[in-house]
Amino acid sequence: MSDAVDKMLAGMAANRQTMNRQLAKIDEIMERSNNTLLHIESNSKAFSQNVALSETQKMYNLRPEAEMTLSKILENFKLLMSSSDQREETYSALEGCLAYRHRVEHLGSSVRKLVALYDTVGQMKNSQEEQYASEDSP
């Protein structure tokens, strides 16, 4: 009987450690995505103020590093979700599952916003390139 209890406690401890690692990874991804969004937002505000001063200046400026950061965030999220789906089945504490679900929904929402932002920035970049190409052609 005590062996079964010990095994159950060991399993719960392992699940807790796994969950703590997942939380740390989610926090890291959220921090990076928030920093990226803040950077993009500050650039957007700076450019919107300067557009009135100079029409020849680019409206959107996205550095390749920012684009790579967004891609890495999305890749890490996919890896995290695929690895956590396997472990979620063995975890049975209701409160832990509900808290985990809430965090995943929040992260999923943030990722959807990042995907939309990435697509929008890509469209703006293509539009800007087309505009420059049409200005360069005689």
From Swiss-Prot:
One of its GO terms (biological process) is microtubule nucleation. It is found in: Cytoplasm, Cytoskeleton, Spindle. Disruption phenotype: Viable but females are sterile. Mutant embryos show increased mitotic spindle length during metaphase and reduced mitotic spindle density. GO terms for cellular component: cytoplasm; HAUS complex; microtubule; spindle. Its main location: cytoplasm. The keyword Ribonucleoprotein does not apply. Keywords: Cell cycle, Cell division, Cytoplasm, Cytoskeleton, Microtubule, Mitosis. As part of the augmin complex, plays a role in centrosome-independent generation of spindle microtubules. The complex is required for mitotic spindle assembly through its involvement in localizing gamma-tubulin to spindle microtubules. msd1 is required for microtubule nucleation from within the mitotic spindle and for localization of Grip71 to centrosomes and mitotic spindle. Component of the augmin complex composed of dgt2, dgt3, dgt4, dgt5, dgt6, msd1, msd5 and wac. The complex interacts directly or indirectly with microtubules and is required for centrosome-independent generation of spindle microtubules. This is Augmin complex subunit msd1. It comes from Drosophila melanogaster (Fruit fly). The lineage of its organism: Eukaryota, Metazoa, Ecdysozoa, Arthropoda, Hexapoda. The gene is msd1.
